[in-house]
């Protein structure tokens, strides 16, 4: 590919030993990545093989903006896999990525924070793969469509627990029954999200809960969805804005018999999901409760 050709002139000028001095024993040289997503500094980077994901995300990328929690990194483009935050010390080379369930692929690297739903993002990448299938292989053509339908059902609150095992079974069938690399790697986003984030799948199915509050079939208002008490936060705020504190208090009492206690112990997770925060600052819900 183009990246290989770009290395040829440097190798001819400086020699193979110079190029092999970078990287690991089995993965020599450097690699270009497109670093994007929830990271302070995005852009094209060139790093030696064997550098860790942590070094890329924090030393080069500057970390996660807004003091958010890192959830994982997806490598290899739409056909790659997801690597959780617990594996950020993983060396970036062909062997280590393959062992973790991902690929080097096209050099894409997407950083994801706590506001990313791993079920939804697996659905997103699989929708691309399914649309790109040429249709020659039956398992790729029909298998990815069946997997996409299952993921859409889960994201819309219609999933079943047995769907998780069915996704794993279909993933292996698509990999084994496809002739080209697209079908062979298409299930990677699904396989790795189930491998590392299975609890999110189970939350979607059992509790109809999306912890990132992004799946439209499960979430009406992100602030209410993330509230441990399930309070109708927008209605509560509207009553306060209209000068009706008694009615606002009644909204809390619909879920909690002791609203004063709620005001004292609430750690206001709704503020982290407040859509107003995307414009300027989140509404200070805890201060409103104090009022």
Identify the role of each PLM range:
Residues 1-215:
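Redox cofactor-anchoring modules in respiratory/redox and cofactor-processing assemblies
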Residues 134-140, 180, 210, 215, ...:
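Short cysteine clusters
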Residues 225, 229-234, 238-291:
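Glycine/serine-rich phosphate-binding loop and adjoining beta1-alpha1 elements at the start
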């Amino acid at each position: 590919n183009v990246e290989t050709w770009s290395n040829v002139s440097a190798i001819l000028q400086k020699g193979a030993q110079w190029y092999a001095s970078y990287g690991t024993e089995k993965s020599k040289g450097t690699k270009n990545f497109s670093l994007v997503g929830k990271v302070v500094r995005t852009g094209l980077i060139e790093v030696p093989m064997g550098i860790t994901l942590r070094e890329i995300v924090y030393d080069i990328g500057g970390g996660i903006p807004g003091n958010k929690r890192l959830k994982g990194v997806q490598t290899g483009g739409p056909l790659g896999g997801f690597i959780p935050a617990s594996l950020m010390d993983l060396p970036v080379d062909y062997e280590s990525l393959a062992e973790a369930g991902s690929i080097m692929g096209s050099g894409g690297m997407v950083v994801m924070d706590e506001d990313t739903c791993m079920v939804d993002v697996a659905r997103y990448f699989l929708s691309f793969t399914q649309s790109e299938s040429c249709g020659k292989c039956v398992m790729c053509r029909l298998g990815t469509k069946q997997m996409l339908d299952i993921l859409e059902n889960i994201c819309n609150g219609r999933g079943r627990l047995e769907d998780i095992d069915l996704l794993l079974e279909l993933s292996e069938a698509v990999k084994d029954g496809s002739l080209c690399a697209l079908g062979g790697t298409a299930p990677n986003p699904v396989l790795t999200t189930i491998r590392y984030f299975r609890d999110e799948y189970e939350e979607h199915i059992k509790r109809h809960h999306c912890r990132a509050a992004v799946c439209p079939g499960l979430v009406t208002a992100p602030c209410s969805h993330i509230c441990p008490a399930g309070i109708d936060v927008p209605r509560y705020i509207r009553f306060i804005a209209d000068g009706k504190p008694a009615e606002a208090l009644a909204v809390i009492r619909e879920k909690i018999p002791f609203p004063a206690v709620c005001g004292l112990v609430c750690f206001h997770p709704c503020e982290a999901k407040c859509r107003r925060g995307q414009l300027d600052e989140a509404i200070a819900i805890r201060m409103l409760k104090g009022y």
